[in-house]
Regions:
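Acidic/polar, glycine-enriched structural segments that form the non-catalytic walls/loops
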Residues: 1-348, 580-582, 738, 747-750
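C-terminal capping/lid segments that line or modulate ligand- or cofactor-binding pockets
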Residues: 17-51, 359, 407-408, 420-421, ...
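Non-catalytic C-terminal accessory modules of carbohydrate-active enzymes
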Residues: 72-131, 609-613, 620, 637-751
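Structural helix-adjacent loops and short alpha-helical linkers that scaffold large soluble proteins
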Residues: 309-316, 331-334, 366-376, 436-451, ...
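Helix-terminus loop motifs that line ligand-binding clefts
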Residues: 330-344, 370-430, 436, 443-445, ...
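The feature captures the catalytic groove of carbohydrate-active enzymes
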Residues: 344-352, 399-438, 442-447, 455-535, ...
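Active-site core of glycosidic bond-cleaving carbohydrate-active enzymes
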Residues: 352-381, 447, 509, 523-667
Length: 751
């Protein structure tokens, strides 16, 4: 199956905005929105953007009342220099898709090559026809490099072709004051310090005012044309201009290759020098070689993560799209992680949430554990900040990771649905353990992983207490469901806390004679008495259960509230968060997303199948799925409970969320968590893959209409391919040793 997605574009505002996100280019370091090079009408609400992962400015966070330790500042991802703008004229007429006639207009995402393409045939108002072919790439091998190959052909006229290629340093972030999921208008966050030509290379250097981060970019061009051209180098305030004018005959083509490099002071001592040197090095070769290496890199990615669905090619394409977008978003160094929108847009201001560990990291743990390790190393890098965050909230010991952040400091201005969501600690702890169980990487655990487990475990011990019945309880926290905040004993949170605490102690006990472990306990000043207290709290954790309904209440007060009538709620009032005051939502039984249901995926041994099924059916009736993190979880748990038809239906709701723009906000950036959740819906849901301390197992079923499906994972150094047919699962060992996999009908060794 070809991994290529083609869209025929009408060039309407809503569709263009969507395609800016879907056809973005990224490599984990830089991300460039799939904007139309020539621009769009000024009155269109478009988000033109280029981003560097982990690069930010600090801006004020206004609080209505200055209460103790509420945050007063936050970080926001920067929109950096625009190097994608190119304007075109055909014999004096400006190329403008809102004028003349569009004869052909398509966008292509070629996941096999690691590029995007744009193909347009346009007739000017006077009838001159132009064929425009554009190829764009962010290099995986040269992370700071972005290229545009801009080919213009005159189809039915002899005349002049003019190209104006811009390097614009004077840029602003996008804002929308009516949507809390986007940033507010903070004005220009970058102060332009340098814009200049150094021979034929354009260089721009900007600096933030508060974080004092320097961002540099360099641009240069190569030109291919049939004859001679007039070339000039211009400079305006905050930008440079490369101008080409060439005479062509009908059928002749002019080709411009635009090379851009980016750098920042988070990573480099001299960003300008790095950008210039990297650009020179990239241009010493030819673009064809860079394309070739890009293709090989992407081929290796799919070779290790390949997933095939026999029986639904369109669905298979959507799966490939999701995996590729995650790959584009993945960090390649310790300075950053994966934002809620990846690098495809400014939704949620480029912040990292619990989504990264709970929904996205599992994909990389199974297919590219080195990238998964980078995600966890980022969390280790901000562990001291998490300790400071815990202290700000009054905790004597331990670490509390911020709800949303870039640098490690809390960026959530609304603490009831932000900072109070202590379960982010549980997500990070769970992912550390999944990484360890899957890879067996004991060195990571001893050097970084166990320290995070112990510090998050300490936090739970401090935030909780024993009630009069001797149960360990956790009060005033918020679970995954953001329509229910500041509650006592959120079932999901308590499960996370118990697991975090018990596994932190278990690892310490199992490696008690290890020198590094002893040094760690000494460094953290953790005594055997404290370890015993942590273990006991985990064992005595209170998990709410309602005898009358036979379900796990989401929290202690949830079942006391009236039930929200979702059927009577008009469609235009969803998502509820944009139409109802938070307090109004908090007073009802209504869920934004999977909460207790998510716990049944992660901690399925805590309850009987009967309790989980009753709870699932109860919460299903009151969950809006306003969050993109929801339907994939309902699919996974439905698979676990044997409700296969329902599992497939929820998966169908999840898999094309971005491609079909079902939440109407993909224009702000793709939903990386949902993409990871879709992967889990197949691997952990349909195939029933489980990896834990005891080993690896599957419990598969075949969705109706599918003939078979397969996927590859890495487990303990081995590359395995699972193929599920109607008769069961086959495991093939492609590299390494054959593990003991429970639940398969056959093991094959293809080495």
């Amino acid at each position: 199956m070809k991994r290529i997605i083609t869209r025929h574009e009408k060039f309407e505002e809503k569709e263009v905005n969507l395609h800016e996100a879907l056809f973005s280019n990224a490599n984990g370091y830089i991300g460039i929105r799939g904007n139309v090079e020539e621009g769009v009408p000024e009155d269109w609400n478009t988000m033109r953007g280029t981003y560097i992962n982990g690069v930010y400015e600090i801006i004020p966070m206004k609080q209505a009342e200055s209460l103790c330790n509420l945050i007063e500042k936050k970080q926001t991802m920067l929109n950096v220099a625009d190097t994608q703008t190119i304007c075109l004229k055909a014999d004096g007429e400006r190329f403008d898709l809102t004028k003349g006639n569009i004869l052909e207009n398509e966008r292509i995402l070629d996941m096999e090559q690691g590029i995007t393409k744009r193909h347009v045939i346009w007739a000017s108002p006077s009838g001159k026809e132009i064929e425009l072919s554009v190829t764009r790439m962010t290099s995986f091998l040269i992370p700071s490099l972005f290229t545009i190959e801009y080919n213009v052909k005159a189809l039915n006229f002899d005349g002049d072709i003019e190209i104006e290629s811009y390097h614009i340093a004077d840029v602003k972030n996008y804002s929308n004051p009516d949507d809390p999921r986007l940033g507010d208008d903070s004005g220009a966050l970058l102060k332009v310090e340098v814009v200049k030509w150094r021979e034929d290379m354009s260089v721009a250097v900007s600096k933030t005012s508060v974080s004092e981060i320097v961002v540099a970019s360099a641009v240069s061009h190569r030109l291919r044309l049939p004859g001679k051209a007039e070339i000039s180098y211009g400079k305006e305030e905050g930008r440079t201009l490369y101008h080409v004018k060439a005479g062509v005959k009908a059928g002749e083509e002019l080709s411009l290759i635009k090379y851009s490099t980016f750098s920042d002071s988070v990573r480099e001592e001299d960003p300008e020098e790095f950008a210039r040197t990297t650009l020179k090095d990239a241009m010493r070769g030819n673009l064809a070689d860079i394309y070739k290496k890009q293709k090989e890199y992407v081929e290796e990615f799919f070779a290790n993560s390949e997933m095939e669905i026999d029986g639904d090619e369109e669905l298979g394409q959507a799966v490939n799209f999701n995996m590729y977008e995650l790959f584009q978003s993945a960090p390649r160094d310790k300075y950053c992680s994966i934002a809620a929108k990846g690098l495809s847009g400014e939704g949620y201001e480029g912040h990292y949430f619990w989504d990264t560990e709970m929904y996205v990291a599992p994909f990389f743990i199974l297919t590219n554990p080195e990238l998964a390790k980078k995600i966890l190393q980022y969390r280790y890098g901000i562990l001291d900040k998490a300790r400071e965050n815990a202290a700000l909230l009054g905790h004597k010991k331990g670490a509390l990771y911020p709800w949303r952040t870039i640098t490690g400091e809390e960026c959530s201005g609304y603490f009831p649905s932000g900072t109070a969501a202590y379960h982010i600690n549980g997500a990070i702890a769970y992912t550390i353990l999944q990484y360890f169980f899957t890879t067996g990487d004991k060195d990571f655990m001893l050097e970084q992983g166990e320290e995070m487990l112990l510090e998050t475990a300490r936090l739970w011990l401090d935030v909780g207490n024993y009630d009069r019945k001797g149960r360990f309880v956790i009060n005033e926290v918020t679970g995954p469901d953001e329509y229910t905040c500041m509650t006592d004993n959120n079932y999901y949170t308590n499960c996370c806390a118990a697991y975090n605490m018990s596994m932190a102690v278990a690892f310490a006990e199992e490696h008690s004679s290890n020198k590094k472990l002893k040094e760690l306990l000494k460094k953290l000043e953790i005594t055997s008495k404290e370890l015993k207290e942590i273990k006991e709290a985990a064992e005595k954790m209170y998990l709410p259960y309602d005898e009358e309904l036979g379900i796990n209440p989401q929290d202690d007060s949830f079942l006391q509230k009236p039930v929200w009538d979702l059927k009577a709620t008009p469609k235009e009032e969803f998502p509820l968060l944009l139409h109802y005051h938070p307090l109004h939502l908090y007073r009802y039984q209504v869920c934004k997303q999977a909460d207790t249901v998510l716990s049944y995926f992660l901690f399925e041994d805590k309850q009987s199948k009967e309790v989980m099924k009753k709870s699932y059916e109860y919460y299903e009736k009151i969950t809006t799925h306003d969050s993109s993190l929801s339907t994939c979880v309902f699919s996974i748990v439905a698979s676990r409970l044997g409700m296969h038809k329902k599992a497939v239906e929820y998966f169908g709701d999840s898999i094309k969320l971005d491609l079909l723009n079902t939440h109407n906000n993909t224009k702000d950036g793709v939903h990386t968590a949902n993409m990871g959740g879709c992967y889990m819906a197949i691997v952990n849901g349909f195939a029933g893959l489980r990896i834990n301390k005891e080993g690896i197992s599957v419990d598969p079923f075949m969705p109706e209409g599918w003939k078979k499906y397969s996927f590859k994972i890495k487990y303990r150094g081995s590359l395995l391919k699972f193929t599920v047919t109607k008769s069961g699962a086959i495991c093939e060992v492609l590299k390494g040793e054959a593990p003991d996999v429970k639940g398969i009908k056959e093991m094959r060794n293809e080495k």
